[in-house]
Amino acid sequence: MDSSIISRRAFYRSIRNEDFTKTKFSQIVPDREGLYLKKKVFLGYTDISAAGSRALLGISVKTISCDLDIPELGTSELICHPSTVTMDIPLLPIQIMHLNDAIIFKFSLIVINTSLPPSKCHLVADKIVNLCSESEIERLVVLTTIKLRIPEKKLAPLYENTFNTRALTTSPSLPDDTKVHDAFLNVLIQMVQLQGIPCNMMIAPGHGAFSSVPTVDDNSLQAIRAFHQFIGGWTRLKFDEKVCLSLEFGRSKKIRRAGTLFMFS
């Protein structure tokens, strides 16, 4: 057997056994054989405000980052960049971060920090859902922001819709007839249901992100804090808010998502 294959297997076996005693604060592992997810997975992506991805990039424990390369996407540019702080976590267009901590080692974070063309969203969703299935995860938690047609005074700070699992919070769920104008989320929801992946959708009200750091005006600041409050209440994960709030959304135009409308039913 090829010795390189043996070494790769040994490397990933050491990751599964949480053998991180000599690991730096953050380390990049190339995308190659052996990609996997731990039992509980958080996913944040570039939706209308990129609040979920910015919330996760502030993780304040040691991580190992894996480049989730999808050749069909071609060259991908980063959407969010740190504006005022130096980050220990490397920024990649699509990455998996395994938490390197003896107490919270069962978590992986997936961050999509690039804009996905509507015609390519199914490629990314398929890769992620297949990884979830192959890794036999216990739960996928998706952090997303949606522009909701609900009067401002009646908006909740966070909603939760579940698929194939129980709720994690007492937050209200969005009605079954809620329309979602988000190509990636549409495809992800369908694939999650098709493959029976236990999934919790944590949804914060949102608007198109400004070309700036998170602000109250586009609701990205409130969404990031709502996500952190939820995660902190369910897990022992901690985040550096200064890092999250320094991540500048790098597009001059608001993101628009094409795609079929999908209901939460």
Feature locations, PLM:
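Generic recognition of well-structured, leucine-rich alpha-helical segments
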Residues: 135-138, 195, 234
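Short secondary-structure junctions
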Residues: 60-72, 172-176, 237-241
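Flexible, glycine/charged-enriched surface loops at secondary-structure junctions
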Residues: 199, 233-252
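Functionally constrained cores in energy, signaling, and assembly domains
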Residues: 39-40, 107-108, 139, 160, ...
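N-terminal catalytic or cofactor-binding beta/alpha core of small enzyme domains
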Residues: 1-139, 145-147, 155, 252-256, ...
